[in-house]
């Protein structure tokens, strides 16, 4: 059975067979649920705690 993964940026769940895997130079693997999360984290270097939409996603996951 495929593993369920969580997004490294927003914390959302990633369905098996979808998402984006990004490997850092130190060997750490980051998983992203969408290109929006990938671009915000890797290219724009934004912190997830400072974005309102990320807080809403994390709050909805906890409820």
From Swiss-Prot:
Q: How is the cofactor bound?
A: Binds 1 zinc ion per subunit.
Q: Does the keyword Zinc-finger apply?
A: yes
Q: Which residues form the signal peptide?
A: none
Might you name a Gene Ontology BP term for this protein? translation
GO cellular component: a single term = ribonucleoprotein complex
Q: Which UniProt keywords apply?
A: Metal-binding, Ribonucleoprotein, Ribosomal protein, RNA-binding, rRNA-binding, Zinc, Zinc-finger
Q: Which cofactor does it need?
A: Zn(2+)
Domain of life the protein comes from: Archaea
Q: Which InterPro entries match?
A: L24e/L24_sf, Ribosomal_eL24, Ribosomal_eL24-rel_arc, Ribosomal_eL24-rel_N, TRASH_dom
Regions annotated as coiled coil: none
Q: Which residues bind Zn(2+)?
A: 7, 10, 33, 37
Looking up HAMAP family in the UniProt record yields: Ribosomal_eL24
Q: Which family does it belong to?
A: Belongs to the eukaryotic ribosomal protein eL24 family.
Record text on subunit structure and interactions: Part of the 50S ribosomal subunit. Forms a cluster with proteins L3 and L14.
Protein's job:
Binds to the 23S rRNA.
The cross-references to NCBIfam families, in alphabetical order and at most eight, read:
PRK14891.1-1
Protein's recorded name: Large ribosomal subunit protein eL24
Where does this protein come from, organism-wise?
Aeropyrum pernix (strain ATCC 700893 / DSM 11879 / JCM 9820 / NBRC 100138 / K1)
Identify the coding gene. Answer: rpl24e
């Amino acid at each position: 059975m495929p593993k369920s993964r969580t997004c490294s940026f927003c914390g959302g769940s990633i369905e098996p067979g979808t998402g984006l895997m990004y490997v850092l130079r130190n060997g750490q693997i980051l998983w992203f649920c969408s290109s929006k999360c990938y671009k915000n984290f890797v290219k724009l270097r934004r912190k997830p705690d400072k974005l309102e939409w990320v807080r809403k996603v994390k709050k909805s996951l906890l409820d």
